[in-house]
């Protein structure tokens, strides 16, 4: 049993358990901090049931688009059912550690609540960097601090007990290694927000 099994097993009850008024309010305040612009093309990695999608659509407007992927078949099914009415949202099965989108496809790539569950984080970041446009942004975010998240995963299931965010120095090193610049990390109770940019070609 692994993280994928955990998410497949919990997909049908995920929103009831985790999509609380607090989380909705948190996302309403968090997503505007991503720096997204109307009309942009955004990749939502590890979308789950799509908790981020309504907030992304609000920021991007009708001219923007969201491609949402998840490695859990059951999560994708839940997400497709919830958001089938949105014309500018595409939901599909995908793993960013393996998925190779075309070069310079997206203005921003968002990883909300997923980064600790990536087994090969360096490969995932390389793929994200490749598919980002020049000056594109990577956002890694959680509704808990890295320390709170570690304890949360240890508590909820043995399948995700070892899934955690690298320490700040390690995260910065990993991002620089995969070509990211302008790295900022906020890690405080109730919020983790990492924003980085793709190297600007001169």
Locate predicted features.
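Short alpha-helix
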Residues: 163-178
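Class I SAM-dependent methyltransferase SAM/SAH-binding core
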Residues: 43, 49-98
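A short SAM/SAH-binding and catalytic strip from SAM-dependent methyltransferases
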Residues: 108-120
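A short glycine-rich, Lys/Arg-flanked "PGG" loop and its adjoining helix->strand segment in the class I
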Residues: 122-134
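A short acidic, Gly/Pro-enriched loop at the edge of an enzyme's catalytic core
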Residues: 97-108
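Core SAM-dependent methyltransferase catalytic element
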Residues: 179-181, 186-202
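Conserved class I S-adenosyl-L-methionine
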Residues: 1-36, 51-55, 75-78, 82, 139-162, ...
């Amino acid at each position: 049993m692994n993280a994928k099994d955990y998410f497949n097993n919990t997909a049908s009850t995920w929103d009831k358990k985790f999509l609380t008024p607090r989380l909705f309010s948190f996302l309403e305040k968090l997503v505007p901090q991503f720096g997204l612009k109307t009309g942009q093309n955004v990749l939502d990695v590890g979308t789950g049931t799509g908790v981020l999608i309504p907030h992304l659509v609000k920021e991007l407007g009708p001219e923007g688009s969201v491609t949402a992927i998840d490695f859990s078949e059951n999560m994708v099914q839940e997400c497709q059912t919830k958001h089938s009415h949105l014309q500018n949202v595409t939901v599909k099965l995908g793993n960013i550690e393996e998925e190779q989108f075309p070069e310079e496809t997206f203005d921003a790539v968002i990883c909300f609540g997923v980064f600790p569950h990536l087994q090969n984080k360096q490969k995932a970041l390389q793929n994200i960097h490749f598919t980002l446009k020049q000056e594109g942004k990577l956002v890694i975010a959680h509704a808990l601090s890295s320390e709170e998240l570690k304890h949360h995963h240890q508590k909820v299931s043995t399948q995700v007990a070892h899934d955690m965010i690298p320490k700040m120095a390690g995260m910065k090193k990993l991002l620089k290694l995969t070509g990211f610049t302008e790295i900022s990390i906020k890690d405080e109770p109730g919020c983790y927000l990492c924003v980085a940019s793709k190297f600007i070609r001169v």
